[in-house]
Amino acid sequence: MTQRKIIHIDCDCFYAAIEMRDEPDLAGKPLAVGGSAERRGVIATCNYEARAYGVRSAMSSRHALKLCPDLTIVKPRMDAYKEASREIHTIFRDYTDLIEPLSLDEAFLDVSEAGHFSGSATRIAQDIRRRVSNQLHITVSAGVAPNKFLAKIASDWKKPNGLFVITPDQVEEFVASLPVTKLHGVGKVTADKLGRLGIVDCADLRSRSKLALVREFGSFGERLWSLAHGIDDRPVQNDSRRQSVSVENTYDTDLPDLAACLEKLPDLLETLSGRMARMEGQYRPGKPFVKVKFHDFTQTTLEQSGAGRDLGSYEQLLAQAFARGGKPVRLLGIGVRLHDLRAAHEQLELFSRQ
């Protein structure tokens, strides 16, 4: 059996990072994203400067301001966060299609079969971190391990902006010293019960038989036994029904005008055509679209029903999109909306059985 290679990517204070990127004056100061104190708002996330004062997610904004009177609280901009998340996932898909999103800022990747960097999951994680930093100007932390349980723990090990790797031969020793509170599914109630039994870390858990743990905790006891031995067979479960396929590039030097943008289209279209070819028979291509992000991080996306997917069609779309901003461009993307042929086939099978 092939040894699995799982990466867990977790953006560092994601919402706050996007706000500091888009408003540089906020950087280096205590910042939170959430509702206003006057309206009994709650903190969604905060940067590390705010955390130093004890500010935390899910805390009331009023209490956060008591802890940190200089705290700046900004309203969430979900569209901006979703767009950044989409850009990150576009990077992920250059390495694998086995992606399990946990939230906008967090995902598992199974790179067991990836051919990049001779199959090195560590180098893939390094490259993802580099590209996210260069393209989005935010940082992510990454954990690399043989399973999801350990990869998630590893990503938190050197936060923020860190990478931690647990190789298969390190699993046994690493897990033995883990506090039981680090185990997936162990909350305060279970941790307290384990503590009363004299079980503080995974070494203590290993001293108990699987049967004894099942007697104490029911079916979850078996899960506890497995985790204490570093075992987690849960697969990375991706939503395989894709809405679109796209390719985009962030340029080292801003493209100054439309002509410079148009010069980049053939290379983008060649890459897109290759990705489309790999999906033949699974999806029917629909509307083409272009995405333009200008040098000031404003952006626009334009799609058109009935348009072709040839170079000329993308040139027309790009010209219209560029006209919306008329400024130097830092990122260009092109893509196609998709219709899932597999879903349609499943519907036909369903009706044929009735």
UniProtKB/Swiss-Prot annotation:
InterPro entries linked to this entry: DNA/RNA_pol_sf, DNA_pol_Y-fam_lit_finger_sf, DNA_pol_Y-fam_little_finger, DNA_polymerase-Y, DNApol_IV, PolY_HhH_motif, Rev_trsase/Diguanyl_cyclase, UmuC
Protein name according to UniProt: DNA polymerase IV
Role: Poorly processive, error-prone DNA polymerase involved in untargeted mutagenesis. Copies undamaged DNA at stalled replication forks, which arise in vivo from mismatched or misaligned primer ends. These misaligned primers can be extended by PolIV. Exhibits no 3'-5' exonuclease (proofreading) activity. May be involved in translesional synthesis, in conjunction with the beta clamp from PolIII.
Family: Belongs to the DNA polymerase type-Y family.
GO molecular function, one term: DNA-directed DNA polymerase activity
Keyword match DNA damage: yes
Quaternary structure (record): Monomer.
Chain sites annotated for binding Mg(2+): D10, D105
Enzyme Commission identifier(s): 2.7.7.7
This protein's GO CC annotations: cytosol
Organism expressing this protein natively: Pseudomonas syringae pv. syringae (strain B728a)
